[in-house]
């Protein structure tokens, strides 16, 4: 859901931060990603940890192109948050998931998170090779 052209952007940067970071470390990373985004870099992340979610929100609010990899897939009749919906409508956001929606509790959450972080890195590496 969103603008598939974001996958073709030449410069991408994966956002991954530990859930154990202090707030000041997250704030520092946020400044780094905002600066990269303002230089034309598309940010990509599964937005799993609190820090990743905070940085993603700040980037999207700053009109920085962003790709979100959803850990749980798309539920039926999925409607993104107003922030995501507006960014999608403006061509600044792409929501992707390699997983089908499942209503049950996800039992392999750690493996999914690791996979999505690796996928984000690979997408960035491929784009940066071409650029």
Task: Identify the residue ranges that each predicted region occupies.
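Glycine-biased, small-residue-rich flexible motifs in mid-sequence functional cores and linkers
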Residues: 1-131
């Amino acid at each position: 859901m969103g603008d598939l052209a974001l996958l073709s952007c030449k410069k991408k940067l994966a956002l991954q931060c530990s859930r154990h970071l202090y707030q000041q470390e997250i704030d520092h990373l946020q400044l780094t990603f905002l600066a990269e985004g303002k230089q034309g870099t598309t940010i990509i992340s599964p937005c799993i940890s609190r820090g990743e979610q905070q940085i993603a929100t700040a980037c999207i609010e700053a009109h920085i192109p962003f790709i979100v990899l959803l850990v749980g897939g798309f539920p039926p009749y999925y409607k993104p948050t107003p922030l995501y919906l507006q960014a999608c409508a403006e061509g600044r956001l792409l929501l992707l998931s390699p997983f089908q929606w499942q209503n049950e509790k996800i039992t392999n959450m750690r493996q999914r998170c690791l996979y999505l972080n690796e996928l984000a890195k690979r997408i960035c590496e491929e784009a940066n090779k071409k650029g």
